[in-house]
């Protein structure tokens, strides 16, 4: 008879631990993506950012890049060398389950009006395994006074 309360308590605690893990995963994923952005776009350490945070078999939905982390290295290495003042300023970040959405201001130089960019990352085991993105040039004469951020 004493086993039933013990079993119930054990199951409750196990369920609580699983829920806590599931709830902390989005925060962990946000931390991974934040560190990835910092290392790639602020530190300009392309190889280390990709080795640390991106799965080598990355599924890429950007129509200009093939799949794989090496394709990102082939693009961002030379690009950031040619544009050493390029920045990605994160304006907001949203995480749910295994997805992280980043809304950022991308500028090639301080004088650039920039682009509003939305990146969506899917993570597994602390690595980015899938990526989508869309971007829009920021107009010089917008139809309203609201910013894109």
Q: Where do the PLM segments sit?
A:
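Positively charged n-region of N-terminal signal peptides that target proteins for export
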Residues: 1-5
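Bacterial N-terminal signal peptides
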Residues: 8-17
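Boundary at the C-terminal end of the N-terminal hydrophobic targeting segment
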Residues: 19-27
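Short acidic-aromatic low-complexity motifs
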Residues: 27, 31-56
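A solvent-exposed, acidic/Ser-Thr-rich amphipathic alpha-helical stretch
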Residues: 46-96, 111
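Short beta-strand segments that buttress and anchor functional surface loops
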Residues: 102-109
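A short, surface-exposed beta-strand/turn
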Residues: 117-128
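Low-complexity, intrinsically disordered terminal/linker segments enriched in charged
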Residues: 134-149
């Amino acid at each position: 008879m004493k086993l039933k309360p013990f079993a119930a308590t054990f199951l409750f605690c196990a369920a609580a631990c699983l829920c806590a893990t599931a709830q902390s995963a989005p925060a962990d994923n946000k931390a991974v993506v934040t560190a990835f952005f910092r290392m790639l776009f602020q530190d300009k350490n392309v190889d280390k950012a990709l080795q640390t945070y991106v799965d080598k078999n990355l599924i890429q939905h950007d129509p200009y890049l093939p799949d794989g982390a090496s394709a990102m290295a082939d693009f961002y290495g030379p690009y950031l060398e040619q544009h050493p003042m390029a920045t990605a300023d994160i304006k907001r970040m949203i995480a749910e389950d295994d997805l992280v959405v980043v809304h950022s201001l991308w500028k090639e130089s301080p004088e650039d009006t920039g682009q509003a960019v939305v990146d969506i990352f899917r993570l597994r085991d602390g690595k980015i395994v899938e990526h989508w993105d869309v971007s829009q040039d920021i107009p010089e004469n917008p139809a309203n006074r609201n910013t894109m951020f």
